[in-house]
Amino acid sequence: MKKRQLWLLVLMVAVSLSLTGPAFAGKLQNQLVKESTLEQILKRGVLRVGMDTFVPWAMKDKTGKFVGFEIDVAKQLAEDMGVKVEFVPTKWAGIIPALLTGKFDVIIGGMGIRTKRAMKVNFTIPYDYSGMSMVASKAKADGFSSLEDFNKSEVELAIKMGTTAVMAAKKFMPKAKRRLFEDQAQAYQELRNGNVHAVVGSSPRPAFEAAKYSETLFMPMRDNFTKEPIAFALRKGDFDTMVFFNGWIQTKRDQGWLQDKHHYWFGTRDWAHLVE
């Protein structure tokens, strides 16, 4: 008798779930859509982009406006979405916490995909690739031509804090001293002042510096010594926004738009007159 009552109860619960399940799932789906970053952007009419200044990813021109590869990417994304774009300059060391607290909608700032970062944020498919290189002082690093030459306790490297350049320096030149700076420009100024042996940074900025200050600086190695995928970063749990961003990136890649923009900003100096 008790077994019969138990089975009857199970049957009633199953029937109840079958009737209410679709409705509940529909409500849950609607709630998720309402709370998605994509929906918030469309309602607000503004795409808020977190970024920091890195030449030539993002920098200010002579009039004080932001220009650069990432700036073009974010502007085109906003245009295709039918919204305006708002850039939120943020110190790199605190850019992920700022995203997580809702200061902006997405990071479009040359952020490399890293395991520790991926534990805090979700990354889209890559829209670009970058790599680490070095520019060195002729006075302090004359004759240096390999990572081994810089992997010495007396060598000092200037690096922007919070960047993948810090990890690259630790991995490939663990013996060298690392001097960290909040701003990329400060690191390069320290190199030009002759206070460090080299700057470790994302290509192509080191090559630009070596060409601009060829009397005092040089490239110890012709090629990058790392390669890393670059992606948008967004808050976890936002599936709709992730799918949209991935689709947009793939479309722009298939159209050749991303490749054209990459060549302009990284393969030429046609933009130099905007900032110099």
Where do the language-model regions lie?
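Bacterial N-terminal signal peptides
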Residues: 9-18
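Extended ligand-binding regions for polar small-molecule ligands
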Residues: 26-35, 72-80, 138-141, 148, ...
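Extracytoplasmic small-molecule ligand-binding "clamshell" domains
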Residues: 26-110, 119
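Short helix-initiation/N-cap motifs at beta->coil->alpha
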Residues: 35, 71, 86-97, 142-144, ...
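Bilobed "Venus flytrap"/periplasmic-binding protein-like clamshell domains
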Residues: 48, 52-56, 66-79, 133-186, ...
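Acidic, polar ligand-binding/catalytic clefts
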Residues: 75, 79, 84-149, 217-219, ...
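A ligand-binding cleft/hinge motif common to bilobed small-molecule-binding domains
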Residues: 94-97, 110-119, 168-171, 192-193, ...
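Periplasmic-binding protein-like
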Residues: 129-136, 203, 207-250, 268-276
